[in-house]
Amino acid sequence: MAFLEYQADHPWRFRFSTILSSPAEDFYLMEDVFSEEEFLLYSPAITSILKTRNAMLWFSLVLSNPRCCQTYGPVVPFNGFEPDDIFFFATEVNHLIEDEDDLIAEIDSNPLPFMLLISGSTLPVLYSKDHHVLHVMAEFDVDSLDTRKFKSSFKTAFSHGVYRLTLKRWGGPPHFSEAYYDENENTLLLSAMTDRGFTELTGAIRDCGLDIPPDADIRVSPAMVSTASEILGRKIDLLRYSGLFKEDVPVEKQEGLDRLNRLIELALPAINAGVQPDIRSIAEKAGYDPETAADILRQVTDQINKMGKSSKRK
């Protein structure tokens, strides 16, 4: 009876958590990234997984007993997803989610979509030099916007009732710091592809006289956007205004981008598995000579290794 009473008071839960420390073999001090609860977990599965890969985040069904917690069923490690990615996914599953308590309740009542995130578990963090590449966005209601005040710091363009404000020096790769003012909806959408780019963008807008908070509403990786779209069966379009200003990409440049994407797509399964890709075969399929392909993939591997070392330090 005591065991049943304990289980009733401590229900099994699916948790997203990170490793704080390992006090003994197969034992891990974990932190639930949404409730911030710390718990001691016994999991030989985690020990086995850590022999072949590093993970930033873990997802598992956790049951507790009076001495420690244990995992039941699959333990899913995520190479590149962060708590912000999971929160974004949850709001796409249920648009009524507003905070961590809502998210935890959604996982408890509807765990299946979160279990399907295993399809993106091996996707790596993307970096451009030292910058983490991800969507960083915020949206505000504004009564009006005098775009003339922005011309010293921004390049401006107009199309179909929407002004695009591209921050000078920060509007190109990897930051892509831009804002879109919709004069019909009286909304201002801020978008950048790095945290630094978003910080510079909000600072420049405040310098132009518009008092906005520095915090982002959305911070999500391209990998999660892609994975969520596949799981939910619909396209998730974060940059709804960018198509109004789409510039024609030269055929040669587009072909080069397509070949690069194909090369990385073919090589990633081997890279994520920790084995050497078949450079000659992959290069031939993607339209590269082996030497060039090897150089590109060496850079990709270096970035993934850098991510792994960073996650270990954390």
Segments (PLM) and residue ranges:
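OB/S1-fold single-stranded nucleic-acid-binding modules
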Residues: M1-E5, D101-E106, L188-L190
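Short aromatic-glycine-enriched beta-strand elements
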Residues: E25-M30
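Short nucleic-acid-contacting surface segments enriched for D/E, G, S/T with interspersed K/R
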Residues: S43-S60
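OB-fold/S1-family single-stranded nucleic acid-binding modules
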Residues: V62-H95
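OB-fold/S1-family RNA-binding modules
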Residues: T91-L116, A179, T194
